[in-house]
Amino acid sequence: MKKIYIAIFCSMFLSGSLLAQTIPSPKEFFGFNIGDDYQLANFTQTEAYFKKLTASPRTKYVDIGLTEEGRHQFMLVISSPENIKKLEQYRTISKKMAHAEGLTDEEAHQLSLDGKVVVWIDGGLHATEVLGIHQLIETSYQLVTRNDDETKKILDKDIILMVHANPDGQELISNWYMKEKDPQKRNMNVPRLWEKYVGHDNNRDSYMMNMKESQNITHQQFLDWIPQIVYNHHQSGPAGSVVAGPPFRDPFNYLYDPLLMTSIDEVGSAMNSRLNAEGKPGYTQRSGTEFSTWFNGGVRTATYFHNTVGLLTEMIGSPAPSTIPVVPERLIPNSATPFPVLPQTWHFRQSVEYSLSLNYAVLNYAARHSDELLYNMYRMGKNSIERGSKDYWTLSPKRSDAIVEAAKAGRPAVDSTAGGGRGGRGGAAGAVTIGGARNGNIALKYYDEVLKNPELRDPRGYIISVDQPDFATAVKFVNLCIRSGLIVQKATAAFTVNGKNYPAGSYILKTNQAFRPEVLDRFEPENHPNDFLYPGGPPIKPYDMTGWTVAYQMGIKFDRILDDFNGPFQRISYGELQPMPLASAPATAKNGYFISPTANNSFIAVNDLLQAGVGVYRLTEASATQPAGSFYVAYSEKAKAVLDKAAKELYVKAVTAPKKPKNIEPINTARIALWDQYGGSMPSGWTRWMMEQYHFPFKVVYPQEFDAGDLKSKFDVIILVGGAVPPPGRDGGNFGGGGRGGRSAGEIPDEYKTWTGRLTVEKTVPLLKTFLEAGGTIVTVGTSANLAYALNLPVHNALVDVVGGKEVPFSGDKFYIPGTILRASVDTRQPANYGMENEVDVMFDNSPVFKLDADAASKGVKPLMWFSTDKPLRSGWAWGQQYLKDDVAAFSAQVGAGTLYSFGPEITFRAQPHGTFKLLFNELYKKGSQK
């Protein structure tokens, strides 16, 4: 027996030695240690190294899809050799536990023992945060080659998904950094966005999944593996600390299962404790960071709506040595930062070592609590199914406020000071005591009035009818739900619910499913709390948006169904994307065709027609059957071929015209200029992507070309997105360094020198005015409405107080509406608004709002959109929303022979608000005689 043990030991030792010889260390492969000063690996090298790691039986290399630039995005699965052989079995268990369908608690308990916990660790999402991908390299090497007890236990209990989040960005940033021979001069100030279209916003795309990388990642997270833990690495940590991480600050989203929040706190505590045990100070959490768990849309945060424990760390460190500064308040130990770090010089390798410790903390926690994590994911999914199968009321601030209002209406309120405010102690300013008692003693009947009110129940489901103006966009919305791992059903025949008839082909989403939080989040408004530093103080800036309800943004028509319902519904398989329904092919019609202006896809068809040389017109007045703005196309074989394809692929319905209409205006393809700048603009990048999807030809134009003048000879339309036009008295562009990304002119490579510069009031605005006067069209979005002020048009900022005869913008404690959906009224008579309805949901991010001067109309300025109520909030947080009543959200202004269209709301925000895309598209055609 002793000889057998010796033989086994020798075999294991030799296999480990051979493995070490087969797999090169990072130093051997890259020529430097990961974390060495002034050294970065690019994607080509990293991809090759990860393929080297596949020599280990602990690994499986998976290509998860192509990036926007055509690179292969990979995921390295790491576990014990035994587990690698049975990956499909463990993947199936992970998905079963996540879906929680058809399982008893006993069966789930057994599966939690039979399965392996799945942990996702990614790197490189934000390419300039170079620690992310480099810690992934180092951690993967350690997991593949180490044979200590902790690593072996981790490999036995965990399935680890090591995911490259942004191959294109790593290649760009690292190549740029390393091409400089002098290490002291190396920098990351690249001339363009490090994700082809959206740069930093690639971490805001996880519920829309516009980018290919987002689709690749979410497919693994929500369909293929559904990990129990997702760890998303970022930089940089708050000044005076090393790393910010979980537990996170409030608020958290009220749709989550409470077990999710306590699980995040548990893992976060394990991470903090690991660093403390290793003598690594500087971890800050909760109030020590800006990061919350409210937002849906990030690689970490989107997982919360799928019952996954999502983790984020933001850590200091760069290839160039840096310094931890003196921040006195960070030097006081407290619950946010129990072990402060002292000011010191900091090297990149230290950040790599911290990351390795944190990764091991997460993996060790997962190994020790493998069955709990698996079972708890099941439990959260089961809870969701049960909540969606009965009457349920989600708790939120609006429900709490409604109880208070019910109590106030039921008995007289008294001075709040008598009872010490809300809860008697530490209450918000203005808290009301009801009937002489503290709010905590409000009668139960007032609770019942709200949280047992059948009209206030959460919906049992939603119906998206075929019968809506833009069903093609509704199908896109349905596919987002399917990509997000939701159960979607489709009606195989007509049916009736609550007395309303629905056609076959309509879609149904019920809430009795494991990812119920995600279902509700797609349809229901977010109810963000009033979050201030202290009563009467400034607002606490949210991590990102506060309201984003996708169905609102996309303009989807749907019905909320509060009671259980059934019908001839066929369940769609998980991940089975829906093809666009087939529209009837247009008949041969000698008088031509009408195309609806209400459907976004109509613009694709129109642009394809124009590119094919087919004449296209728009109705300037409504006909007996078609609204104003409808497209008219004369019959030709070429036109019919384009429309046949559009009917088949885009669900564009071409309606036969009984005769050629009289009140029509020809349109042509316009020469479109889209502003951008050195270093890249995310709003411009998103707009660029949108225009490519809808087949608008355009040219990206940089400030120097604008300043060269003679714009009308080159362009018909100019698009100025947020950040392009400075406010009066300031220079343009939202990147530093005079539009050079922080570099001196001499450091810019020759091929990019024409990209530098910025728009200015002094030089650029007069040239833009000349362009307008000559008949050009300019569209501004968001803050670029500053152009109207620079042109001295009869419009003013509506959100100001007048102090000492001067306009002073509202303070944050008076007005604050960050990343929120509001309802605006629309003048549908205006050509700029063709295809729109009388009201529209708009994305408002502390956006410009206008008051028109008394003589504005006589000077050619017309309101396009405005806020007609003192409560325009639809989803999110709108402090001071009453100040918006009757203010203008968008306007058109005649300037000479041209027109300026200014939209305060973000009508193209991250390519999400399909409901307002037409507000841009309508302005992108040249009007006049056919060529």
Mark where each language-model region is.
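Divalent-metal coordination cores built from histidine and acidic residues
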Residues: 155-160, 167-204
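Bacterial N-terminal signal peptides
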Residues: 7-17
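Short, solvent-exposed turn/loop segments enriched in Gly/Ser/Thr/Pro and often Arg
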Residues: 162-166, 177, 232-240, 784
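Intrinsic-disorder/low-complexity accessory segments
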Residues: 21-158, 204-205, 210-212, 216, ...
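Structured alpha-helical segments in the cores of large, soluble enzyme domains
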Residues: 107-109, 181-192, 217, 229-237, ...
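Core alpha/beta catalytic barrel or barrel-like domain that forms the active/cofactor pocket
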Residues: 187-208, 230-248, 267, 271
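Positively charged n-region of N-terminal signal peptides that target proteins for export
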Residues: 1-4
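Acidic, glycine-rich active-site loops and adjacent beta-strand->loop/helix elements
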Residues: 125-127, 163-168, 206-208, 237
